């Protein structure tokens, strides 16, 4: 019986010539055309046992592929050009991809030009980017490869601070490519992380590129009323889905988002004032009732800062209160601050540089009802008076933008809405052009380059150009609307001394 002789790494395999003749694959057809009878055909880059497995496949149309031998069989099948075995091997590898081997498979797919495996391994890296940073192969990714991964719209990061930590870990292994830091969008980062990067001697250039990472974009939480029950829904920019988080039967409450949880504060249930504060985790949808506030109240003003929820003023039955208190996220004790100079409800409160500003609202007793224009600032553990608003307003919505305050007023006694800018450093109010008039609830959020206003429609106000955009949107029955970025970055005053500890804490929190 005639045989064809193959030499692999010095080992000899004799193959029945009939198997070679019957083979439909190009490699063996070329052997039929050019093989000289007494010469051994030398095969380079192929494993001896993998070649035996291919010969078994040609004889019996069966092959034993496992996670342990798949790579060597796939390499042999590519070199010998046996497409059915290539497909079987690729399917096996894709089926077994996980966060611990996806970078290795990614590199393997590039080396041998396997598109399906490349796409599957890239998808695994994108979905598990924080986990794969622990792989020793992570630091060997090229600058262009990591840029492609982190620029993908579906990369699984929920805050730009996480992106920053991924880059810092890679830069530690690739110090000559520090300019990759410029893929960051500083406006989506916390001040703490920006300060840390600056202390490392790195400079992030102002980016004009569009934001591609959906996960760092603003989440949305909306509460809509229907038949006395309000439904809470959450929109994730990464999944692009709305999900129902739960329901609440409160009225006249306030709400705010802190550490990816929605807090629902005070208000009334069945026409009775309540002390309680409920919290729902927007990711797990789990509810928790946190410690009661110091008193029964509705129509409070709330703001958040440094992991704390602040509740200011409100209406205790028919009397406005000056109580100010805060609850640190994850704790169970309310801490009292000094009372407001003027008790009020329905005013606005906002943080600027760790100081609280409270403005407008209503002061009421059993005998009095006074619409306010005064402004108070809590700084150095006391309330002080600031320049009053140009007019008296019972309802005020306010946000901080670029170190100043922008306030929009509601309509009750007034005949129109007003837009003001409070210049903090000058203690000065100026009136700006107001694009619309709306009777009813409004919701105001600071969103990077613009301020979002939800009223009878969706409005975007751009402070730097003093211009407006209008978008049609159904706002019927909306009781609460907020946009937020997920923020779990450890808060601290970052200095050269505390920098290593801060970065270590961030790595433990974000990348492990």
Swiss-Prot record:
Residue intervals of the BACK domain: 102-176
Xref: InterPro entries: BACK (IPR011705), BTB/POZ_dom (IPR000210), Kelch-typ_b-propeller (IPR015915), Kelch_1 (IPR006652), SKP1/BTB/POZ_sf (IPR011333)
Keyword annotations of the record: Kelch repeat, Repeat
Kelch repeat windows: 216-261, 262-307, 309-354, 356-403, 405-449, 452-498
SMART domains: BACK, BTB, Kelch
All copies of domain BTB, residue ranges: 2-67
Family the UniProt entry places it in: Belongs to the poxviruses Kelch family.
Name of protein: Kelch repeat protein C2
Species annotation: Cowpox virus (strain GRI-90 / Grishak)
């Amino acid at each position: 019986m005639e045989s064809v002789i193959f030499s692999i790494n010095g080992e000899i395999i004799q193959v029945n010539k009939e198997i070679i003749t019957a083979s439909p694959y190009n490699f063996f057809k070329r052997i039929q055309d050019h093989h000289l009878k007494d010469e051994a055909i030398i095969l380079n880059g192929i494993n001896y046992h993998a070649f035996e497995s291919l010969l078994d496949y040609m004889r019996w149309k069966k092959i034993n592929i496992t996670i342990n031998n798949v790579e060597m069989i796939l390499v042999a099948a590519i070199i010998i050009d046996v497409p059915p075995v290539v497909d079987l091997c690729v399917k096996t590898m894709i089926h077994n991809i996980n966060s611990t081997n996806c970078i290795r498979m990614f590199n393997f797919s590039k080396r041998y030009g396997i598109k399906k495996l490349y796409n599957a391994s890239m998808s695994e890296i994108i979905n598990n980017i924080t986990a794969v940073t622990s792989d020793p192969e992570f630091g060997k990714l090229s600058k262009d490869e990591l840029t492609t991964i982190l620029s993908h719209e579906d990369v699984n990061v929920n805050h730009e601070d996480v992106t920053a930590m991924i880059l810092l870990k890679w830069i530690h292994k690739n110090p000559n490519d520090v300019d990759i830091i410029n893929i960051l969008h500083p406006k989506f980062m916390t001040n703490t992380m920006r300060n840390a990067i600056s202390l490392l001697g790195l400079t992030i250039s102002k980016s004009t590129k569009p934001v591609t990472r959906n996960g760092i974009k603003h989440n949305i939480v909306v509460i809509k009323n229907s038949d006395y029950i309000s439904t809470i829904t959450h929109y994730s920019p990464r999944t692009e889905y709305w999900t129902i988080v739960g329901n609440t039967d409160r009225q006249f409450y306030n709400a705010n988002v802190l550490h990816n949880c929605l807090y629902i504060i005070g208000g009334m249930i069945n026409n009775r004032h309540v002390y309680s504060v409920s919290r729902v985790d927007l990711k797990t949808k789990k509810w928790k009732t946190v410690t009661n506030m110091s008193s029964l109240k509705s129509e409070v003003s709330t703001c958040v800062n440094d992991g704390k929820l602040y509740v200011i003023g409100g209406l205790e039955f028919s009397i406005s209160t000056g109580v100010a208190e805060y609850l640190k996220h994850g704790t169970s004790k309310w801490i009292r601050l000094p009372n407001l100079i003027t008790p009020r409800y329905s005013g606005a409160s906002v943080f600027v540089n760790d100081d609280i500003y409270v403005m407008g609202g209503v002061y009421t007793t059993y005998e009095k009802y006074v619409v306010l224009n005064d402004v108070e600032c809590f700084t150095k553990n006391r309330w002080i008076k600031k320049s009053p608003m140009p007019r008296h307003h019972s309802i005020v919505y306010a946000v901080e933008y670029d170190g100043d305050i922008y306030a929009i007023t509601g309509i009750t006694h007034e005949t129109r809405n007003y837009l003001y800018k409070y210049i903090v450093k000058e203690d000065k109010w100026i009136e700006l052009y107001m694009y619309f008039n709306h009777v009813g609830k409004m919701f105001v959020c600071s969103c990077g380059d613009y301020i979002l206003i939800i009223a009878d429609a969706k409005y975007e106000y751009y402070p730097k150009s003093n211009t407006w955009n209008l978008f049609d949107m159904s706002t019927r029955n909306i009781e609460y609307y907020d946009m937020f970025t997920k923020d779990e970055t450890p808060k601290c005053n970052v200095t050269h001394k505390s920098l290593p500890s801060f970065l270590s804490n961030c790595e433990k929190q974000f990348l492990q």
